[in-house]
Design a protein with these regions (language model features):
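Short helix-capping/linker segments at secondary-structure and domain boundaries
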Residues: 43-49, 67-78, 117-128
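Acidic/histidine-rich, surface-exposed loop or edge segments in extracytoplasmic proteins
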Residues: 15-25, 57-61, 75-77, 131-139, ...
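Active-site-proximal helix/loop microenvironment
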Residues: 52-59, 63-70, 168-172
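Active-site-surrounding "flap" and adjacent substrate/cofactor-binding loops of secreted or lumenal enzymes
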Residues: 19, 68-100
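Mature N-terminal segment immediately following signal peptide/propeptide cleavage
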Residues: 35-45
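Non-catalytic, conformational "gating/processing" segments within enzyme and secreted inhibitor domains
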Residues: 49, 91-172
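N-terminal low-complexity, Pro/Thr/Ser-rich intrinsically disordered segments
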Residues: 5-33
Length: 172
């Protein structure tokens, strides 16, 4: 594979604890917005004759986490695509995580992270780190996006999936 060099990514959330956050009660309007997003996602992604495994929930989480760092026109466009404001989306997705993790014989373990290039110009605000920790339990990492980062991402995924997914990328 293209992953051969060993190096450590910088964990920007080191020392940040997951705090208390408001989980939505999963209202009809929030569910309708999420279903609308999922339908549009599939309509714009799936090609005839193609087999695809795609999780709208995972895509919503990824876009929700990145929306927490967006401002201005980027944030407005993201919220328009998602069908709700970022604060509502954060609460909605936390509500689903809570609901899916409760009781029964079902076991659900979600793992989220954001990876930034080491040469990222924007400053990462503590509020971005804290919000993503509170609502998504997400780690935020800074890395050079080279072969070493490939190895770090695969190690992160392997750890979070208890080895069920040993490798997710071959190269960056």
């Amino acid at each position: 594979t293209g992953c051969t060099v060993t190096a450590q990514a910088i964990d920007l959330t080191e020392g940040i604890q997951r705090g208390t956050a408001y989980a939505s009660s999963l209202t009809d309007s929030e569910n309708a917005a999420a279903v609308d997003f999922a339908v549009r996602l599939f309509q714009n992604t799936v090609q005839d004759g193609e087999t695809l495994l795609l999780s709208p929930f995972s895509v919503l989480c990824a876009l929700g986490m990145t929306a927490n760092g967006a401002q201005g026109e980027t944030l407005s466009q993201t919220e328009a695509v998602l069908g709700m404001k970022k604060e509502a989306l954060n609460s909605y997705l936390l509500g689903w995580q809570t609901h899916l993790s409760q009781g029964g014989q079902t076991q659900l373990h979600l793992a989220n992270s954001v990876w930034l290039t080491a040469d990222s110009r924007p400053t990462v605000n503590k509020s971005f780190l804290q919000t993503n920790a509170d609502y998504y339990g997400a780690g935020i990492y800074k890395a050079p996006f080279n072969d070493a980062t490939c190895k770090s991402i695969n190690a992160w995924v392997r750890e979070k999936t208890d080895g069920l997914i040993p490798q997710i990328i071959d190269a960056i």
